[in-house]
Amino acid sequence: MEAEVDKLELMFQKAESDLDYIQYRLEYEIKTNHPDSASEKNPVTLLKELSVIKSRYQTLYARFKPVAVEQKESKSRICATVKKTMNMIQKLQKQTDLELSPLTKEEKTAAEQFKFHMPDL
């Protein structure tokens, strides 16, 4: 029984040695065939880091999803309020026969920016 254990132990040592040699050869070939990428990280390490980054992203997404929903609802409420205000102003203008002076350059720019950010209007 002890001889079989020793034999298995030697097999594992040889396998470990073979893996070390394969790793050494791969690193050597990468360095010689692609010297400019020799400073790059090991792909396995990059995958582990990617996994950590993905986990962080999911955490951030979970934290900020309610904020995004609330922001969207706020934007909708603001748009509704602006629409009501614009309608009231138009009604008042019609009732009083009041004409507005043309918009200044700054006012036109502000109106364009507002329409860009609030396309629902």
Swiss-Prot record:
<keyword id="KW-0137">Centromere</keyword>
<dbReference type="GO" id="GO:0000278">
    <property type="term" value="P:mitotic cell cycle"/>
</dbReference>
<dbReference type="GO" id="GO:0072687">
    <property type="term" value="C:meiotic spindle"/>
</dbReference>
<dbReference type="GO" id="GO:0005829">
    <property type="term" value="C:cytosol"/>
</dbReference>
<keyword id="KW-0963">Cytoplasm</keyword>
<feature type="modified residue" description="Phosphoserine">
    <location>
        <position position="101"/>
    </location>
</feature>
<dbReference type="GO" id="GO:0000070">
    <property type="term" value="P:mitotic sister chromatid segregation"/>
</dbReference>
<dbReference type="GO" id="GO:0000776">
    <property type="term" value="C:kinetochore"/>
</dbReference>
<dbReference type="GO" id="GO:0000940">
    <property type="term" value="C:outer kinetochore"/>
</dbReference>
<dbReference type="InterPro" id="IPR026762">
    <property type="entry name" value="Ska2"/>
</dbReference>
<dbReference type="GO" id="GO:0051315">
    <property type="term" value="P:attachment of mitotic spindle microtubules to kinetochore"/>
</dbReference>
<dbReference type="GO" id="GO:0051296">
    <property type="term" value="P:establishment of meiotic spindle orientation"/>
</dbReference>
<keyword id="KW-0132">Cell division</keyword>
<dbReference type="GO" id="GO:0051301">
    <property type="term" value="P:cell division"/>
</dbReference>
<protein>
    <recommendedName>
        <fullName>Spindle and kinetochore-associated protein 2</fullName>
    </recommendedName>
</protein>
<dbReference type="Pfam" id="PF16740">
    <property type="entry name" value="SKA2"/>
</dbReference>
<dbReference type="GO" id="GO:0170027">
    <property type="term" value="C:SKA complex"/>
</dbReference>
<keyword id="KW-0131">Cell cycle</keyword>
<dbReference type="GO" id="GO:0031110">
    <property type="term" value="P:regulation of microtubule polymerization or depolymerization"/>
</dbReference>
<keyword id="KW-0597">Phosphoprotein</keyword>
<dbReference type="GO" id="GO:0008017">
    <property type="term" value="F:microtubule binding"/>
</dbReference>
<comment type="function">
    <text>Component of the SKA1 complex, a microtubule-binding subcomplex of the outer kinetochore that is essential for proper chromosome segregation. Required for timely anaphase onset during mitosis, when chromosomes undergo bipolar attachment on spindle microtubules leading to silencing of the spindle checkpoint. The SKA1 complex is a direct component of the kinetochore-microtubule interface and directly associates with microtubules as oligomeric assemblies. The complex facilitates the processive movement of microspheres along a microtubule in a depolymerization-coupled manner.</text>
</comment>
<keyword id="KW-0995">Kinetochore</keyword>
<dbReference type="GO" id="GO:0007059">
    <property type="term" value="P:chromosome segregation"/>
</dbReference>
<dbReference type="GO" id="GO:0007056">
    <property type="term" value="P:spindle assembly involved in female meiosis"/>
</dbReference>
<dbReference type="InterPro" id="IPR042091">
    <property type="entry name" value="Ska2_N"/>
</dbReference>
<keyword id="KW-0493">Microtubule</keyword>
<dbReference type="GO" id="GO:0007080">
    <property type="term" value="P:mitotic metaphase chromosome alignment"/>
</dbReference>
<keyword id="KW-0206">Cytoskeleton</keyword>
<comment type="similarity">
    <text>Belongs to the SKA2 family.</text>
</comment>
<keyword id="KW-0158">Chromosome</keyword>
<keyword id="KW-0498">Mitosis</keyword>
<comment type="subunit">
    <text>Component of the SKA1 complex, composed of SKA1, SKA2 and SKA3. Forms a heterodimer with SKA1; the heterodimer interacting with SKA3. The core SKA1 complex is composed of 2 SKA1-SKA2 heterodimers, each heterodimer interacting with a molecule of the SKA3 homodimer. The core SKA1 complex associates with microtubules and forms oligomeric assemblies. Interacts directly with SKA1. Binds directly to microtubules; but with a much lower affinity than SKA1. May interact with NR3C1; the relevance of such interaction remains unclear in vivo.</text>
</comment>
<dbReference type="GO" id="GO:0005876">
    <property type="term" value="C:spindle microtubule"/>
</dbReference>
